[in-house]
Amino acid sequence: MTPTSPQLTEHVLADRVLGGWLGRIAGNMLGKPVEQGEVWTRERIDRYLRQAEALPLTDYLPEPPSREMESALRSEWRACVRGRIHGSCRDDDVDYAVLGLHLLETHGSAFTTEQAGELWLLRLPYLQTFTAERAAYRNLVNGLKPPLTATYDNPCQEWIGALIRADVFGWTNPGVPRRAASLARRDAVLSHTGNGVYGAMWAAALVAAAFTARAPRAALDAALTVIPASSRLARVVRRVISLHESRLNWEETLATVEEETAGLGWIHTVPNAAVITAGLLYGDGDFTRTVTLTVRGGLDTDSNGATAGSVAGVLCGADAIPAQWTEPLEDRVRSAVFGFDGVRISELARRTVELAGR
């Protein structure tokens, strides 16, 4: 295997890909207990952390500081808070990375949207899909073909589901964001349209660019080139970049963008991309700061933490991710994807490296 970019030795590529997997899983686990944007606002998340004496946040969420806080957490919290983690929790944000790897191993980079749908039916349980993916799955079972699978009776076409499936296309195209975006688009149109598809293209390009970018801003700039400049997604990413450049602090930036995207809902691609962008910019390449700011930003916390963690993990590499994030994962993934439950994270990374640049 020859690394795609001349800047990446095989050792560096392997470290960065493993960093992407570890970062995605750790970021997902960090955000999972508070994944419900209409309940867990930025203010409430920080109130939880203050009551638990956990600000600044430098590790997984602490156990709930009160009965009132505990009752609002997702039921999986007991396996996702510090001191209780033994391997990853099962989550769709990780399932789709696993399934995407299997798609590329099975069909290669020339896979079709129809082949992606066939693998869903073969490998992914219907009740472990949500929102746009569940609508598309139902449409597949009823005999519809893409792109009708995305458009028929699917009110979630611009939600974040396609974005969370995109990382593997970046990991396998290091330093080549446009190619990563092309593969992500082919996958995304199974279930999404418009900004839902652009979100997947943007995320894949962002991850791919992180392999050779010197800083998060460079990766963000590269990712913007693969989506329409007039799209609402591109406009909100540029807006966050502009607010960051104007020296607003992180809280002020998110408050401004929250007001400007009001009404889209907490699972829509656009406001979540703003939270991810802010986490990356204000995290400034530091893994811990990036994932904690992103999750504290609220909305779809586990998805946002996963994507920001993937980008930050690629930027710094696995060796530079602090041990408090990686050791509790015990190199093990729980997955609903048939045949993959209990697979080692290091094994997933090794198989991803084998596909890089193909």
Could you tell me what each predicted segment is?
Residues 1-358:
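Structured, active/binding-site neighborhoods that engage oxygen-rich ligands
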